[in-house]
Each structure stands twice: as structure tokens, then as C-alpha cells.
């Protein structure tokens, strides 16, 4: 192995070795040595058509910091500033969230022209990915319920592991799904 001198090459070699086992769902990858400063997330979707200063909220994900804040925040409100730094029209706001996951952060919100501040703890990108996954599942479930007149259940298995199988079984056997005619 004299030519394996970095983590990427080692991961490639390990993946090839694992491939020789002829089993599924195996592999090795290298995570990289990028910046340790992670950009936090607010767990919201913004209105891309809004052209004014700030960020106009289009949708707030269930379980996000804005959904669980003490002040009721709704779609249509505008985030004018993050920790006192104003957000101008078209400005890249991500640098304002660098390193803020899990740290108290002040947002200035505008509701019909009236401004107020709230303090939240932004979430990591990984946590937001979990919220996006749950949102995707719920949207799929709603589509299946609507198109089947609630006759077909929708479940999704997140991964090939014991916890995911337990969740799948729990959902299949729930009062909501147990007596449905079919499962997707």
C-alpha cells in the first residue's frame, strides 16, 4: 500500500475491497477536511419572487425553530435582520448563519410593516434534512390518502436498519393504517 497516501484513496480502496464481498449496501467514503464552520438553518422556505429587503417566509417546516418559537410566526412575515445585520434585496444571507447552529440568534421580523425581535436557536443542516424528510413523507401520505380516498396506506422505510424496520412495523400496524386495503 505504498501509494495510498490520503484518505480519499484509502476510501476508494476500501470500497473496492468491500465490493468483493458481494453484499448490498456496503461501501466506504471519505468525508473530507473542509471548513469546520457550518452554516445553520432556520427550517423555512422563502418566497423566491419577493424582491424587497429581507427574506419573505413562504413555508415554515414543522419542528423548525420558527415553528416552535414562543412568538407565532407565519408565512408572509419578513425576516429583516439576523443578529442586527440587515438583509438587503438579493443578498446572500447564508454567511449571517455561519456557526450559529444551536446558538441563540436574534431575528428581526416584519409583520405588515411592524417590526419585532425574536430569539431562536437555528438548527444544523443535518437536522434540517431530517425535517425535510418528515415533510416529504407527510406530503406523500397526503397525496396517497387523497388519490385513494383513504383506502391505501403510505409508509416509507428510511434505511435498512432495525430502527427503520421498527418504525415501518409501527406505522403499518397503527390504527390509521391497519385496516386499509393496500400499502405503498
Question: Which residues does each PLM region occupy?
Answer:
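Amphipathic alpha-helical substructures
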Residues: 1-25
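PDZ/PDZ-like peptide-tail recognition elements
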Residues: 16, 20-63, 67, 142-146
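Conserved catalytic motifs of ABC-family nucleotide-binding domains
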Residues: 76
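Cleft-lining beta-strand/loop regions that shape enzyme active-site pockets
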Residues: 1-2, 31-35, 56-59, 63-65, ...
Amino acid at each position: 500500500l505504498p501509494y495510498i497516501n490520503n484518505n480519499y484513496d484509502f476510501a476508494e480502496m476500501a470500497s473496492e475491497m468491500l465490493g468483493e464481498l458481494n453484499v448490498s449496501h456496503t461501501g466506504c467514503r471519505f468525508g473530507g477536511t473542509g471548513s469546520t464552520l457550518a452554516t445553520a438553518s432556520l427550517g423555512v422556505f422563502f418566497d423566491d419572487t419577493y424582491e424587497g429587503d429581507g427574506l419573505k417566509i413562504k413555508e415554515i417546516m414543522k419542528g423548525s425553530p420558527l415553528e416552535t418559537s414562543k412568538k407565532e410566526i407565519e408565512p408572509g412575515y419578513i425576516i429583516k435582520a439576523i443578529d442586527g445585520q440587515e438583509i438587503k434585496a438579493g443578498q446572500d444571507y447564508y454567511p449571517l448563519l455561519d456557526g450559529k447552529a444551536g446558538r441563540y440568534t436574534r431575528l428581526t421580523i416584519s409583520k405588515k410593516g411592524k417590526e419585532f425581535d425574536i430569539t431562536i436557536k437555528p438548527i444544523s443542516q443535518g437536522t434540517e434534512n431530517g425535517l425535510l424528510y418528515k415533510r416529504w413523507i407527510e406530503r406523500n401520505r397526503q397525496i396517497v390518502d387523497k388519490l385513494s380516498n383513504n383506502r391505501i396506506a403510505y409508509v416509507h422505510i428510511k434505511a435498512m436498519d432495525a430502527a427503520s424496520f421498527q418504525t415501518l412495523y409501527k406505522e403499518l400496524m397503527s390504527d390509521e393504517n391497519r385496516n386499509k386495503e393496500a400499502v405503498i
